[in-house]
């Protein structure tokens, strides 16, 4: 299963990519297990209220993630504490943590060896490249992993 998440525009990208895998990217095929942790407003607001905003992804990951899953954090800065908490928990749970990030990877680069770095500090440029990379990922998975 692939678990996507991010904040703001990156949250939208996470939802978009998970949907491409569940429904279809280009062709009719078996669904690829994927989820975005940015869609459940009840969970997001309850976790934010009861535990703190920095745990909105790690708490869901604790409930929904399994050893061998793949997480993809999407970020323009690499400095969001909620992504860092998810990276830390992923390691403890045996979940493969990957990230797309601009801004030199920010603090998040300390917590993953699987960082695709977009060499820009301009949010709009970073977001365009991140969704492009996500589309490449969807195409690859649909072509090779859904057989």
Features from the language model and the residues they span:
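Glycine-rich phosphate-binding loops that contact phosphosugars or nucleotide phosphates
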Residues: 4-5, 10-147
